[in-house]
């Protein structure tokens, strides 16, 4: 491989090429009348999806420079997806349009730094306007919750109503997870006991689902301890028993490091042991209580600690906890329990309620209520079915997007949907003046780009956007939308065409962030195959093995 430095108009042209690819490929999935995209896989059949994030990740241009730029676009989608799990298509539309407009101005000789400063100045004003437009969503108004989910699920009422039903059952503090159903073609909601806490996997090598970057273990044992584990010897007897059982193991400990962690990772990679490890939640006495909560929920006989005098070497499978399912992300762990009618769980809940009543500290009461909510709130499992594997995966993507959107709406409220929130917010830029001509260009770019999402939604419906946008603006009603599904003008909240304010905010913020970086990029260094490597079956740096791991 050799390095090539690309700059000037050649780089700007590449920016525009990739932005056009994104705008024509990712953007066509937007809205209830958006289209699906097929993504070829190295193995198996192509995946058919309307998930903008998946489509963006699937774009891999042949030219090395364009491929490098596309990966930066994909990172912007990834950031948006990580923060709210939705809004990636809107983010892609905004980013690509900002890049195209800014690149044209830079090619015309305008100062890129001044343009970026104008974009940043406009961003701050728009974010305040989005916040002022937001309306709080109440869990009592279950129809509003359903509408948020329906919109994000591309108009699927079954998905929206199922998510609303789940939220109603588990409440604001409850946990909702998604899994694929075996044998069913329907979307089902199953209520079970469980809990979620804010600790993720200790090593990415524990990941079982590389596409979603999560650990998913069915019917695992749970070893729960207050101790810090750094040597493997005390764990060997129970690990051998786990291997013989054929079931996975989840270890929750104060910390796991050194030899203990590396041995678990190596055995997991070799396929001999299905295992994952996470740090215990909380701190101090609160950590001890939360570990006891988890032990009660999973039916573990002990939380292993020095005071008990129980040695790790003497543990048997009967001493461990069990769960129906454990899902671990980089930030959270969700335990779905099989102990739904356990007397010990009920007794634990009553004990915490009693502590809340007798506590005189507001802080302690708050933490006790958090524990009570985790233990009693339950877990709603959305089981996604379908006639084929392709249908199940496509539907699961939409269910997860809708679930993330619903959570975001509960957090920061809702705004009119159908792309009008950004369109109406752009009006505040009429009074914003830049300190220079270039700054004003940046402000004008944002004003123009904020109409891109609604233009694309209308275009995907086969309609002319200019006429519709002109009518909406002239009515001077910030709750008026064009419903591309019903093909009529309507009040956003009456028609249920609403978006989570947080999703709109994050999509816009992320797009501005990525566009600002690319706008101020003068040169890029890219790797291209050298002449010797062009005839080689393997590119430079490729090896036939794993490097002797």
UniProtKB/Swiss-Prot annotation:
Main location: cytoplasm
Sorted UniProt keywords: ATP-binding, Chaperone, Cytoplasm, Isomerase, Nucleotide-binding
The protein's enzyme class: isomerase
Compartmental location: Cytoplasm
EC assignment: 5.6.1.7
Residues annotated to bind ATP: 29-32, 50, 86-90, 418, 499
A GO biological process held by the record: protein refolding
GO CC terms in record: cytoplasm
GO molecular function terms noted in the UniProt entry: ATP binding; ATP-dependent protein folding chaperone; isomerase activity; unfolded protein binding
Cysteine disulfide partners in this protein: none
SUPFAM superfamilies: GroEL apical domain-like (SSF52029), GroEL equatorial domain-like (SSF48592), GroEL-intermediate domain like (SSF54849)
Catalysed reactions, semicolon-separated: ATP + H2O + a folded polypeptide = ADP + phosphate + an unfolded polypeptide
Entries under Pfam families matching the protein: Cpn60_TCP1 (PF00118)
InterPro entries found in the cross-reference section: Chaperonin_Cpn60_CS, Cpn60/GroEL, Cpn60/GroEL/TCP-1, GroEL-like_apical_dom_sf, GROEL-like_equatorial_sf, TCP-1-like_intermed_sf
Subunit structure: Forms a cylinder of 14 subunits composed of two heptameric rings stacked back-to-back. Interacts with the co-chaperonin GroES.
UniProt similarity note: Belongs to the chaperonin (HSP60) family.
Function: Together with its co-chaperonin GroES, plays an essential role in assisting protein folding. The GroEL-GroES system forms a nano-cage that allows encapsulation of the non-native substrate proteins and provides a physical environment optimized to promote and accelerate protein folding.
Protein name: Chaperonin GroEL
Species of provenance: Wolbachia pipientis wMel
Annotated gene: groEL
């Amino acid at each position: 491989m050799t390095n090539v430095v690309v700059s000037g108009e050649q780089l700007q042209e590449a920016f525009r090429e990739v932005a056009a690819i994104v705008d024509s490929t990712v953007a066509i999935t937007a809205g209830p009348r958006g289209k699906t995209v097929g993504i070829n896989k190295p193995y198996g059949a192509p995946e058919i999806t309307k998930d903008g994030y998946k489509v963006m990740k699937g774009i891999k241009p042949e030219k090395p420079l364009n491929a490098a730029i596309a990966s930066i676009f994909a990172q912007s989608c990834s950031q948006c997806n990580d923060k709210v799990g939705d809004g990636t298509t809107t983010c892609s539309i905004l980013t690509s349009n900002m890049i195209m407009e800014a690149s044209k101005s830079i090619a015309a000789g305008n100062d890129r730094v001044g343009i970026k400063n104008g974009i940043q100045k406009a961003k701050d004003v728009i974010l305040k306007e989005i916040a002022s437009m937001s309306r709080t969503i109440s869990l009592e108004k279950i129809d509003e919750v359903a509408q948020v989910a329906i919109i994000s699920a591309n108009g699927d009422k079954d998905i929206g109503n199922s998510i609303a039903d789940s939220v109603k059952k588990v409440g604001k503090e409850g946990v909702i997870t998604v899994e694929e159903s075996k044998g069913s073609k329907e979307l089902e909601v199953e209520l079970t006991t469980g809990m979620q806490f804010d600790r993720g996997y200790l090593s990415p090598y524990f990941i079982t689902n590389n596409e979603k970057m999560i650990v998913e273990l069915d019917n695992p044992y749970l070893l729960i301890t207050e101790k810090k584990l750094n040597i493997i010897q005390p764990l060997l007897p129970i690990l051998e028993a786990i291997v013989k059982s054929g079931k996975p193991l989840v270890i929750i400990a104060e910390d796991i490091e050194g030899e203990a962690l590396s041995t678990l990772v190596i055995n997991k990679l070799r396929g001999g042991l299905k295992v994952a490890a996470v740090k215990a939640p909380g701190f101090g006495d609160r950590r001890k209580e939360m570990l006891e909560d988890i032990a009660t929920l999973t039916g573990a006989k002990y939380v292993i600690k020095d005071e008990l005098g129980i040695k790790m070497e003497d543990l048997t499978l009967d001493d461990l906890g069990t769960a129906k399912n454990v899902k671990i992300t980089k930030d959270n762990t969700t335990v779905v329990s099989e102990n739904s009618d356990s007397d010990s769980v009920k007794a634990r809940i009553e004990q915490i309620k009693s502590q809340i009543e007798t506590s005189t500290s507001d802080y302690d009461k708050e933490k006790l209520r958090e524990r009570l909510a985790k233990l009693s709130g339950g877990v709603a499992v959305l089981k996604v079915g379908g006639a084929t594997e392709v249908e199940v995966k496509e539907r699961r993507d939409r269910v997860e997007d809708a679930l993330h959107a619903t959570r975001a709406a509960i957090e920061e409220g809702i705004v009119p949907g159908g792309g009008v929130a950004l369109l109406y917010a752009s009006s505040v830029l009429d009074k914003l003046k830049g300190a220079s001509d270039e700054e004003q260009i940046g402000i004008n770019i944002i004003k123009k780009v904020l109409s891109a999402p609604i233009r694309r939604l209308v275009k995907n419906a086969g309609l002319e956007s200019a006429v519709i946008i002109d009518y909406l603006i002239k009515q001077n009603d910030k709750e008026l939308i064009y419903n591309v599904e019903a093909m009529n003008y309507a009040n956003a909240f009456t028609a249920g065409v609403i978006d989570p304010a947080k999703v709109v905010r994050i999509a816009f913020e992320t797009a501005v962030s990525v566009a600002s970086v690319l706008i101020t990029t003068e040169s890029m260094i890219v790797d291209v195959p050298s002449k010797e490597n062009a005839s080689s079956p393997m590119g430079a740096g490729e090896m036939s093995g794993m490097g002797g791991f």
